[in-house]
A protein has these predicted regions:
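Short amphipathic recognition helices of helix-turn-helix/homeodomain-type DNA-binding modules
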Residues: 1-22
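Hydrophobic protein-protein interaction segments
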Residues: 18, 24-199
């Protein structure tokens, strides 16, 4: 059910994203995701370039979609902001979205978000296949409630609380995380790429 714009990012109150198996009780909400693009930290120009590539070519609501996507990021600035644990494919840092200026600003923004004490961003190198290439996903739950998985495809988004689906996606995340660079190495890489590639 749902659509790519109907996942946990659009419903932070109902699905304050958290993953019980990746946190200790009482640590508050957390957001754990694997992604092929830096959606939680997208700049306006980057979001606009991504959304402009929709296959239906319908740009009538582009401004509205961009504004909605940026508004969802406000959850990260709250005092009660969730813990964010995001694993990005290295290709995100090198794929030309919107041109050099857009990419440089986007990676500076990503580096800024990575400095937030509630945020962990790791980069997985592009040297081979990994489970994160199969789908964009978010694992989410509320304290005391069963975890929920949001899976996004090119056609739609799907939310499920199936225990088997949650277990499968959680295992995928663990495997992706095991192959990713450390937080410190990832941070330095995110800082370095704009100067080396997008000048």
């Amino acid at each position: 059910m749902g659509s790519p714009e109907k996942g946990p990012e659009t419903a932070p109150v109902r699905l304050v994203p958290a993953v019980g198996r990746h946190r200790s009780p009482g640590h508050g909400p957390a957001l754990v995701r694997a992604a092929r693009r830096p959606r939680p930290a997208a700049t306006e120009e980057y979001a606009r370039a991504i959304l402009s590539a929709r296959p239906d070519g319908n740009l009538d609501d582009l401004d509205e979609q961009v504004a909605a996507r940026l508004a969802r990021q406000a959850i990260l600035d709250r005092t009660s902001a969730p813990q964010l644990w995001c694993i990005l494919d290295e290709g995100v840092l090198h794929r030309a979205i919107g041109g050099s200026k857009v990419m440089r600003s986007q990676l500076y923004r990503l580096a800024e978000v990575a400095e937030n004490p509630k945020t962990t961003i790791q980069v997985i190198r592009s040297g081979g296949a990994h489970a994160g290439l199969l789908a964009h996903f978010v694992i989410a739950d509320l304290d005391g409630k069963p975890p929920v998985v949001y899976l996004e495809t090119a056609a739609e988004g799907h939310i499920t609380d199936s225990s088997s689906a949650v277990a499968h996606v959680a295992l995928s995340f663990d495997r992706i995380r095991a192959g990713a660079e450390s937080w410190a190495v990832s941070r330095d890489l995110i800082r370095k790429v704009p100067e080396e590639r997008w000048t």
